[in-house]
């Protein structure tokens, strides 16, 4: 059993966001990104295949946004991601920030559907991020 009592007011918004996301769906998302260990001469020349890493973040909630006028008419989605889950992946992958994690992300998979990130924003309280909001669009299959 773990002690989840907040020690100060700063951690309360993060705990509230985590509880809300878990109670809404409790879903998880996979962030597919290129491996950060491709710093060899062979990989720079394209002689080795690019490797990918999947980072799982949970809890998340996905919702479809209201249609807005766009030239392509593609639906947009918003993925609400727990800041504590993002921080855990940033530490696990030894990255400097959440912005770097989202920059490396090529694809987001939720419920078997693939999405591309259009933009990332964060919500914060008391100077600490408690939720990330990813604006997504569906990834269309590429024809070869």
Model-derived regions: residue spans:
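Short, conserved turn/kink motifs that form compact alpha/beta structural patches or helix kinks used as
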Residues: 2-8, 33-144
